[in-house]
């Protein structure tokens, strides 16, 4: 019945010329925000979507998908999403917890017996970036392995003996190593590779047919090419073996697939509501102070209401997604150049849409 009422409302809105004018004005304002950052029509660009109640109300693309071939971006191009991958990793861990195969309170030595101080670091610490372990992306020796094929165990061995930055639970410090560990634990517990687990239990289940574990070798239709900007102009992105970022940043997706992802989270298609909510709450440090990160999402506020946010950055690509639960507003943006960031653009769009729709009420 609720869906029928929404469809009737949308139909009436479509018939009302005043609402069409309202939508056009909103679109013009959104365009202006994006064009202020994405200025080069002949360079790499970005794609953006705004959805309300699960339905797109704005979709537009800017710039080139491939500069050399002069191919324009369209809304259905596939982008590397970088650290937005962490959302999928966190939900996968919660799925395993719901199945009784692990708990977020488990210490990691239960799964990796030789991990230094593994009896003090929990899965919860990894999920919330409070483990204190060394972030491998900050290690100078990363360049030595960046283009090598690494197994999850090899990745863990790469950073596990580094001196820790702080005791588990003492502070929040964004950490990619923690999410690599989560992917490794997922494989040990499930008996599946991370790639296969996400593909089978999430992407296929939700019909996210344009999303996958990233690869530079496979031919992928509608793939956006990544770029970097130097003083001399644009160059192709730095090559990285995706086994290195692994479960911390190796997925590819589209605007429409990410909307399916958000819709599935809203409808609890992957987890029971009480388990899903674990990802979207703030947690406390050892001193009792709350910090603004759940499991795979930053939990912040925008104009006095809660927002769930996460971005991503990997060679040649940037991404950003913002969800406002109280208004069911989802804004997502992708860029195929590290010279154009969708982060502030997406936040500004979300704020504009929130303010506009709130006033319209």
Go through each PLM region and give its residues.
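Mobile, glycine-enriched helix-loop/loop "lid" segments at the mouths of ligand-binding/catalytic clefts
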Residues: 218-230
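Short, solvent-exposed loop/turn segments at the edges of secondary structure
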Residues: 121-122, 159, 174-176, 220-222, ...
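Bacterial Sec-dependent N-terminal signal peptides
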Residues: 1-26
